[in-house]
Amino acid sequence: MLANYHRLKSGVIKQTEVIPFEYNKKYIQDTYDTYGDGRIQMAWLRIGHILGNIGGFDTLLDVGYGNGDFLKAAVKVAQCYGYEINGYEIPEGCTFADDWQEQDVDVMTFFDVLEHIPDLTFMRHLRAKYVVISVPDCLYHSDQWFENWKHRKPNEHIWHFNEDSLTRFMEENGYICMELNNVEDCIRIHHEKNILTGIFKKLTI
């Protein structure tokens, strides 16, 4: 294991010492606003994937909604809430949720978000019936692979998951895995598995 990283019992890899990272509008513009048509395709892919796995739902909360592309699509099928720290206004028809950790919703989504949050202990207290997550898929072939991996971004990406560790992490927090795949790779094309997407159901609600 590389210096300043350690592996948890679940198999999740965590950066040990972290320098706070600033997330603002420029970060979103540089990271996501350059995707062009892929932004809209991704939003509808995500909606379709959720509907295909859990069926219809009434309420959805998107944590870290970025530039709002996903919520602009989701609001067409459900009552939507969102939370973001970067300064982007929430899309029309959606409600900003300052108290997002206390929200009772059918679906809570974390697209490209979980790996950035320094403290994930809040996960065990979520009240959503379903949680949907997309994170970089950390295959960890070797220390050298991990050192050169494009998604190893110290201080920005703090947590690293693969299929097994994400499943165990969510089980520890009261959710069972319904579906786990690399569906977003049809848009985020890469030479190997790139983005891991999981849909999880709360054991008790």
Regions picked out by a protein language model, each given a short descriptive name:
Residues M1-V107, F111, L120-L126, Q144-W149, ...:
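Conserved N-terminal segment of class I S-adenosyl-L-methionine
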Residues H116, H157-H160:
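Histidine-centered active-site/metal-ligand motif
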Residues H116-I117, Y140:
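Short glycine-rich, flexible loops that bind phosphorylated cofactors or substrates
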Residues V132-S134, M178-N181:
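Conserved active-site loop/cleft motifs that coordinate metal ions or position small ligands
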Residues G174:
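Short glycine-rich hinge loops at helix-strand junctions in the catalytic core
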